[in-house]
Amino acid sequence: FISPPSKGTSLTFKCKVGITVIWLLLGAVLGYLFLVIAFCLPTNRMRSHLESTPDVFYNGSVALVKDDLATHLDYLTEATILSEAIYDGNESPFVKAAAIYSVLPPEGDENWSYRKLISSLSATNESAHGPYDRYWQGQLAILRPLLLLLDYKDILRLNTLVQLFLMLWIAHLLSCHSLTHLLFPLALMFCSLTPIATGICLQYTPCFLIMAIGCVVLLRHTNIINKFNWLFFLSLGMATSYFDFLTYPLVTLGIPLILYLQLETSSPSQRFFQITTCSLSWGIGYIGFWAEKWLLGSVILQENLFSEAYNSIILRSSHETLGQTITYMATLKNNLQAYDLRTWKILWLLLFLVTIVLALHRHCLTLHNILAFSPLCLVACMPFVWYYFTQNHSYIHFGFTHRELSITFFALSCFLVQLCNSAHIE
């Protein structure tokens, strides 16, 4: 929580702790109320807008391009989200917002995702249902109102347009900051997220939008963020905990943090300090806001969600799955295979070669310059640390957890481009 004196404010440590606690509590109250309001909305129209949707899920999870992991669409979770959005049981909105119920599909020969959505569309008050109360699932506070106006296909098209618009806005803001040399790393990062998939899968949307909106806010209000960087990253962590379904959450820290470092003129040691404090703030927001959901759910539902959450954390961070031992290298292999394409290999080879040639030609390949931009290399390592502590989850769900590596792509490409763009320093 402590920022370097040159970039910080006059707020004391105790004051920052107090603001953090108030911010977390206020966020939890507002987040819960948004969900309560969303569950007060009528469901009939939402269901009618999803009547043509189940056929999309008939074959379950798919890859848009055969054998291309990066285009994988997790329709199992997608069907769960849609089923939760149209749940219409007898419980009060306050209970629904805490429990996040969905109808349990009956046994059958069809794919689980298809059965899940079909049974949800035809459900009655007596239909079997179950909660998914470990997560906030704040995406429902937006999805339910949208389903009153749009069908599933309309929402996906809107999502694609919003994501593209945000990336173009970031590119424009980089130009306004005279950071046009970062446009190539931005494009590289955008491609590594496989926007063709993130645009048409609601599950992949929250982290992308939080990351992109965070970058826009950072670039538009740089002076304010410099003064309150801890609060900015705390808010990003809270938003990620609220909206995300544990897909690739680290990008909401890593990508804005990389941009933040590009806007800084401080020394490498100060930048390492900023990486630590900003990451700590994000982590407190992410974990703290999640813990608030468990506390809130435990009180409202009269259940011990902390016990369930603890068991889930132990499972997701374990080195086993279905009795099989997982190695860290196996987890890395699963996630790296999404980028095991000739296109990426050639692109990175060319980038390294061009960097070396230009750096030598411009006489900027110096130890001083390398050390000046070395904090970016630390950020580039973040996904690998994340994979180590979430081996079970990252090994199983590599179809979307591989997107954490977009942080590495962005950080390394920024490092190389900055090295070429730097002036020679004796």
Regions found by a protein language model. Name each.
Residues 3-15, 219-229, 261-273, 360-367, ...:
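Membrane-interface junctions at the ends of membrane-embedded or membrane-associated helices
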Residues 141, 187-210, 237-240:
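Aromatic- and kink-enriched transmembrane "portal" helix at the membrane-lumen/periplasm boundary
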Residues 141-159:
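Juxtamembrane segments of multi-pass membrane glycosylation machinery
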Residues 160-184:
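Transmembrane-helix motifs of polytopic, lipid-linked glycan transferases
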Residues 229-257, 274-288:
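Membrane-interface alpha helices of multi-pass inner-membrane proteins
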Residues 275-355:
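Membrane-lumen/periplasm interface segments of specific transmembrane helices
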Residues 356-380:
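Membrane-interface helix-loop-helix junctions at transmembrane boundaries of multi-pass membrane enzymes
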Residues 396-419:
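Hydrophobic/aromatic-rich transmembrane helices and adjacent perimembrane loops
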